């Protein structure tokens, strides 16, 4: 699958999980940290994102495994994207 498509899917999930508008998820800059989107105030959001990243990795058979605790508020959007690629 196209890496750009998967990257945009990750960006969409980052925004969707925290309740932000998703209509232009593809424009989300890679250098933004998750705490900007309130992931720092609610640890459960990180756990949900981990599950979604694992679903994306499994769906597109990237070979990556995302475990509980792998995502934290200090991760950037780019780091989250890299988690799903082998």
Describe each region flagged by the PLM:
Residues 1-55, 60-86:
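Phosphopantetheine-dependent thiolation modules in NRPS/PKS and related acyl-activating systems
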């Amino acid at each position: 699958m196209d890496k750009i498509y998967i990257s945009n899917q990750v960006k969409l999930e980052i925004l969707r999980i925290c309740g932000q508008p998703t209509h232009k998820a593809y424009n989300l800059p890679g250098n933004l940290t998750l705490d900007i989107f309130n992931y720092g105030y609610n640890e459960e959001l990180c756990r949900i994102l981990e599950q979604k990243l694992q679903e994306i990795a499994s769906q597109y058979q990237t070979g990556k495994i995302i475990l509980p605790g792998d995502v934290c508020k200090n991760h950037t959007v780019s780091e989250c994207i890299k988690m799903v690629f082998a």
